[in-house]
Amino acid sequence: LHVVAPLKPKAQWPEVKAAMKALADSMSADSPDDYVSTISKAKRKGKILIDYLRNGRGATAVAPYSTRARPGAPVSMPLSFEELSPAILPNHFTVENVPSRFAGTDGDPWEDFRKAEAPLPSKLGKVRKSR
């Protein structure tokens, strides 16, 4: 699952990456049984990888509506927050069922994406929950 949030255009690549690293490190420190911020597959087994490296200039990520090179031909599908559920797994949308998804929607779930633009928070990842 890639979480995408629109930032005000004044945010610079290095500060966005640093903020996302702080958030990833904070999440993995607060809930080490659930999250990890290191790429090592051995360290992330059974955990959710918070991959802050996708936020670096030149980093790649799968494009919306792209077919993945995996069994069943899953498709990268933009969703609204309201559509998220535990039933939607990485292979939920495929080249077989995407046409019926399009037929059952009113349009692009990201149509108003830019309306949610916000500045990069200055304290991201610094506020830690108490244990």
Each language-model region and where it sits:
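A generic structural motif
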Residues: 7-13
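C-terminal accessory nucleic-acid interaction domains of nucleic acid-metabolism proteins
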Residues: 14-131
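Short, conserved phosphate-binding/catalytic loop or strand-edge motifs used
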Residues: 1-5
